[in-house]
């Protein structure tokens, strides 16, 4: 647990997920981020609270395995990722930089 205190929050949160589904969840106060696969829920919660100055109610995580793809040289695989869906107690995060439509 002491390692998570010294970890830089920008090493935990990689990028916001830009998709129709994640954009629709913003109305419910849920934000989706790509996160470091080695990070846990408490590290993700601390990172979001530090970066965006908001209170986090809960964090749900999911591991997505990379798709198997055919290449010229045989079979390859896309990178596996970890996503976190963060629910806020109150407040908003301006991650897309504009007003919601």
From Swiss-Prot:
Pfam families: Ribosomal_L23. One of its GO terms (biological process) is translation. Keywords: Ribonucleoprotein, Ribosomal protein, RNA-binding, rRNA-binding. The keyword Membrane does not apply. Gene3D superfamilies: 3.30.70.330. It comes from the Bacteria. One of its GO terms (cellular component) is ribosome. One of its GO terms (molecular function) is structural constituent of ribosome. Part of the 50S ribosomal subunit. Contacts protein L29, and trigger factor when it is bound to the ribosome. Belongs to the universal ribosomal protein uL23 family. One of the early assembly proteins it binds 23S rRNA. One of the proteins that surrounds the polypeptide exit tunnel on the outside of the ribosome. Forms the main docking site for trigger factor binding to the ribosome. This is Large ribosomal subunit protein uL23. It comes from Micrococcus luteus (strain ATCC 4698 / DSM 20030 / JCM 1464 / CCM 169 / CCUG 5858 / IAM 1056 / NBRC 3333 / NCIMB 9278 / NCTC 2665 / VKM Ac-2230). The lineage of its organism: Bacteria, Bacillati, Actinomycetota, Actinomycetes, Micrococcales.
